[in-house]
Amino acid sequence: MNGAESLVRTLVGGGVEVCFANPGTSEMHFVAALDRVDGMRCVLGLFEGVVTGAADGYYRMSDTPAATLLHLGPGLVNGLANIHNANRAMSGMVNIVGDHATYHRQYDAPLASDIEGLARPNSHWVKTSPDARAIAGDGALAIAAARRPPGKIATLILPADTAWNEGSGPANVPPPARPTPPSADAVEEAARVLRSGEPTLMLLTGRAVCEDGLALAGKIAEKTGTRLVAQGFNARTQRGRGRVSVERIPYVVDQALGVLAGLKHIILVGSKMPIAFFAYPNKPSKLYPEDCEGHVLARPDEDQIAALEMLCEAVGARQIPAPVVNRERPVLGSGAITSGALGASIGALLPENAVVADEAMTTGRGFFAPTEAAAPHDWLSNMGGSIGFGPPLATGAAVACPDRKVVGLQADGSAMYTVQALWTQAREGLDLTTVLFSNRAYHILKGELASVGAGNPGRKALDMLDLGHPDIDWVGLAKSLGVPGARVADMDGFNRRFAEGLATPGPYLVEVVV
């Protein structure tokens, strides 16, 4: 058994059942080993950003790391934007990055690079496995690192001769680590703040915005009168009818300042004190008042559900009913296409237990409120801000949840970064409907031009934000990648085609001209 097979058997034995891959020459022994080992699903991506973004989506919906297979340093670099997003979302993944044979490195071949140096800024654990007999043990360490709560990025570098030489067989992987128990002192401090009567907000993310966490937080809010707010972007929010609703901190600085004005205390549950996404002239970086104090109830690596249970007990909220959403779904939007009408129709048509991958950008800013009373669903957001995460994320979520409908809400400019994900969706037959908002512009940047005080843009500036000339034919592009679809220009057309996509097994794309 060579080193590559030893590694694959270790991955499968350690619960890593999916490998999103874009291999090259140095990874051929790993690819060959996949044929000899049962239990590993291999999913090909035509660009490394699709591979790493899919691993992020897979972890968010399965709580289990996938492996990625990347080709040397340039392959890793091509995938780094979505590794950055996964890191910010606290998703676990095991990156297997091929390298030249150890004896070949001295010759500085064209693809040679400092892979460890490239990996380290966005990895919690990095190692180059020195020989075939070490690779299985190193693979076990990588899996253990990726499974550390709440999820970590592990990067294992696999030299070609480590893969092809005789290995030592698979290694055992230790059981997954459990979250750190919450601090009793932190719980008592939060309870004291809630009893003080001063303006207080609980800022939630992570497990706290999943169904169980929101139910507990809702009980606490009902008992104490505190406000519940989620971070502006969250890895996975469970929402819809029968669940506790939570608003998000707005992206726009002035709006966020209004939401947080007058606060004296923020209780942090998996979150950190809120700051602006970017710096803007004459606007603060901190979104909270200067005299507002932060109190950590639970860090990201701590058991947030246990912390909320303890706080619920401490404030006497255990028997309080959680304030769940019980309104009817919104009615279908009609007439001209607007953000509000789209949000209403999405909320009306979204199927039970759907997964929404949201990279709708400017068009989608109004979607959260009208989908509040939709059927129960999970909402996945971009935690790292690097665009092109939506199509890969939706792909990984669909691999993780084959029995659930995945809906991608997708801006056109961002989609062009990772459009290759459509091909993977078609090849794998993933049950995924993409709603592509085609405003033929980097529309968000038009607002940013004004926000940063850049003055009145001229022709050259506006050309940098324009995605027309030529217009992208999204239906034709999707068809060329194996995904059927339709273009719509009014709400009646959208309602019909979105419903058609939801009813169609496999991938489907609705281009919405906005």
Regions found by a protein language model. Name each.
Residues 205-209, 330-331, 411-413:
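Conserved short loop/turn motifs at secondary-structure junctions
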Residues 96, 104-111, 223, 366-514:
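Thiamine diphosphate
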Residues 47-48, 107-109, 177-191, 249-250, ...:
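A general structural motif
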Residues 2, 133, 157, 270-364, ...:
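Phosphate/pyrophosphate-binding active-site segments
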Residues 23, 97, 160, 232, ...:
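Short, small-residue-rich loop/turn micro-motifs
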Residues 1-321, 349, 432-434, 499:
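N-terminal alpha/beta PP-like core and its mobile active-site loop of ThDP/TPP-dependent enzymes
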Residues 4-17, 22-25, 30-37, 323-403:
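Active-site diphosphate/adenylate-binding microenvironment
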